Amino acid sequence: MLILKTMDDAQLGVLYETCMRRDFPPSERKSLSAILKMKHRGLYDVLGAYRADGVLAAYALLYHPADGRVALLDYLAVEPAFRHAGVGSMLLAQLRAHYADAADVLLIECERPKAAPDETLARKRIRFYTQAGAQLTSVRIWLFDVEYSILVLPCGERIPACDWAEQMLSLYRQMLPKALFEQNVRLIRA
């Protein structure tokens, strides 16, 4: 069993400088100042998943606007010592329960396998999320020079009908300054 706890700014700073720098390439990592700004505005959740002995096993960062019924799973990683032991799946199950009253779905960006530097790893990530109940949508989006496929993970029992492309664009319009959005966010039409 994992215990979900909201991380404070100091914990986030340590997490960012150690874990996030290790777990995510620069092209996929927002700046710490951008994350803190969204967190202070109440739009961003930074959650640690701890074992009963208080050791951090995994973490997740989510963008969740107060007026929306979706949350964007921006980052999820399992500490190296706990990988391949079901910790990531446990965390996803807990995130679904944690957001059940506030969101219908968690939107997930996964690097598109055919565009990824490591196609096998990208396929494994998508398989991890689909095995946890997520559905791969037809939506593809280009964010800051990285091409992503979009998955939808229900927080309840079903996925509501929705224009997921518009949901993603709407989230990024809210998250980014207009000029940054216009320069770095593109929907890819199949």
PLM feature segments, named:
Residues 1-34, 50, 154, 163, ...:
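Short amphipathic alpha-helix that is part of the acyltransferase structural core
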Residues 17-18, 25-80:
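A conserved beta-strand-loop-helix scaffold within acyl/acetyltransferase catalytic domains
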Residues 68-70, 105, 146-148:
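A generic structural signal for beta-strand entry/edge sites
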Residues 73-76, 150-154:
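Short, well-ordered beta-strand segments in beta-rich or mixed alpha/beta enzyme
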Residues 78, 84-98:
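Conserved acetyl-CoA-binding loop-helix of GNAT-fold acetyltransferases
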Residues 99-121:
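Conserved GNAT acetyl-CoA-binding A-motif
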Residues 117-119, 124-149:
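Conserved catalytic-core motifs of GNAT/GCN5-like acyltransferases
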